[in-house]
Amino acid sequence: MLSNFKKEKMNTSTTFYEIICTLEKYWHNQNCTIIEPLDISVGAGTFHNKTFFGTIGSKPISMAYVQSSRRPSDGRYGKNPNRLQHYYQFQVIIKPSPHNIQCLYLNSLKKLNIDCKTNDIRFVEDNWENPTLGAWGQGWEVWLNGMEVTQFTYFQQVGGINCNPITTEITYGLERIAMHIQNKSNIYDVIWNQDMNNNIITYGDLFLNNEIEHSSYNFKYADSKLHFDLFEKHLQESNRIMKLFNNLLFPAYEHLIYSIHYFNLLDAKKKFSTTQRQTHILNIRNTSKMIATNYYKKQK
């Protein structure tokens, strides 16, 4: 049991855990299949293989999931109240895109007891791009009282393949939504869960030490020589697998994701010159495009 448990009465529907449960239930009722997160270190929910492969081709998809995400360069040693190197996203992927998708999203906020009439909710144009995945889309940031809480994207390309039909991706920033709902100014004060005896576990109880230690590792103590070797080897393995007769595309994609993670760790320590960085991104993107192209051909 955590030593710094606190006792106070509150509505458990406002906990971080209940926010996830509410979103899962809501999107399940909109005919989304609730799946599990990808068990690999990724920078965003978009990297989930169900999203990458699911957006390619004409087969309909409708899925939602929580994804643990890592961006090593965003670490702040636990000192920034709303900036993290490890965080959680709730991802919704639907193809073809429903005509009322924005209404569905706003209704999901209502389920979280976020009043769309009394709060300032704005869709701010912000077209999205992921160079390593060869992906881009048209969309918006959703601001809640001046803070970005969601990214709303209509995918145009993934892996260099035109998306037809268009896929809609909704990415909820769970930490910031929880901060708003619980009226907290610091993410580490957000209540993650409350048991039947009113014992409370905060976000800080669970993740503050992790954030501090990983920030130190990412910026100071990571073995860059090892990580560069792993980056190259995983990218090489991804390309090697694709050359096999049976085209093992899912394993190839996994090794691509591993290589991207090590690239991000190296990038956090600023180990690349501008030219080197662009060259590596191009090599990663070329591999992702080959995976996407081979997958697209198999769907025909």
Curated annotation (Swiss-Prot):
A GO MF term: glycine-tRNA ligase activity
Gene Ontology process terms (BP): glycyl-tRNA aminoacylation
Catalytic activity: tRNA(Gly) + glycine + ATP = glycyl-tRNA(Gly) + AMP + diphosphate
Pfam family, one: tRNA-synt_2e
GO CC entries: cytosol
Class in the EC hierarchy, top level: ligase
CDD domains linked to this entry: GlyRS_alpha_core (cd00733)
UniProt subcellular location: Cytoplasm
EC assignment: 6.1.1.14
HAMAP family on file: Gly_tRNA_synth_alpha
Cross-referenced PANTHER family: GLYCINE--TRNA LIGASE, CHLOROPLASTIC_MITOCHONDRIAL 2, GLYCYL-TRNA SYNTHETASE
Family to which this protein belongs: Belongs to the class-II aminoacyl-tRNA synthetase family.
SUBUNIT field: Tetramer of two alpha and two beta subunits.
Descriptive protein name: Glycine--tRNA ligase alpha subunit
Species for this entry: Buchnera aphidicola subsp. Baizongia pistaciae (strain Bp)
Classification lineage: Bacteria, Pseudomonadati, Pseudomonadota, Gammaproteobacteria, Enterobacterales
